[in-house]
Amino acid sequence: MNIAMTGGTGFLGQHLTGVLTRQGHHVYILSRNARETEQKNMTYVQWLSEGAAPEQELPHIDVWINLAGKSIFGRWTEKTKQHILSSRINATREVQRLIQKQKEKPKTLIQASAVGIYGTSLEKTFTEDSATSDEDFLSHTAHLWEKEGQHIEAMGIRTVYARFGVMLGEKGALPLMILPYKFLAGGTIGTGRQWLSWIHVEDAAQMIRYAVENAGISGPMNVTAPNPVDMKQFGKTIARVKHRPHWLPVPEFFLSKALGEMSLLIVKGQRALPKKAITSGFRFTYSDLEFALSQLIADRKTV
């Protein structure tokens, strides 16, 4: 299949491109910067920049994968929050415009979202059947992001809303979470009771590939491992794998002072389960956190 991907140069996008091209799909990566590649089954197409005309360069596209959006890591000023939201909305609207330009519509859209759409809770468990929330910046952003995708779904295109948990890999949150343990200063963050719905980046890429190739999957899909953990368990698992102590607690108020509103990512959470992936037959390689962390650290993919 011909697959167009936004956000293809990012953390997940690079892994996903490898998975899809190895399956024989041709991936067209939409990027602000034009570039050449000798990699088989991969083409870069310039978009969202001066002089770009992706509608003239793209062939018929069978599947769109929309991952584009500014990273949520970093202190959230009002300007940063505006950019986080607008980058996602504008990219999705441009995808819609490009789809409308095609003579033949694609079969599928994979629209990125996040488990933050459920809000936060210590007690509740969230599946794709659960109600969504609009209680904070993350849930509000995910809600509006999916709403933009619904305009494309209304064109009769099978749409999967990939609600991502915290991805573990060589980039993203994990290197930052491991860093204190390198300096023998690891410990429980906040109360330690907050949930972390994690997923190994390779399982995340494989789950998206699975959704692309299985026409029976549509609507929201939690892209998380089947065994979420609380932050205390997560920290103790890092300590075991790294052979480092777990002893120095990090109070919630300290994180709020240091990180501002972004501390919400760390001190709040939700227990999200991948019900749709499991019932449809997807098989996880990394369902156990200790195995996932051991593999990442052993392969030196993570500092």
From Swiss-Prot:
InterPro entries according to UniProt: DUF1731 (IPR013549), Epimerase_deHydtase (IPR001509), NAD(P)-bd_dom_sf (IPR036291), SDR39U1 (IPR010099)
Pfam families registered for this protein in UniProt: DUF1731, Epimerase
CDD domains named among the record's database cross-references: SDR_a8 (cd05242)
Lineage of origin: Bacteria, Bacillati, Bacillota, Bacilli, Bacillales
Protein name in UniProt: Epimerase family protein YfhF
Family statement drawn from the similarity comment of this UniProt entry: Belongs to the NAD(P)-dependent epimerase/dehydratase family. SDR39U1 subfamily.
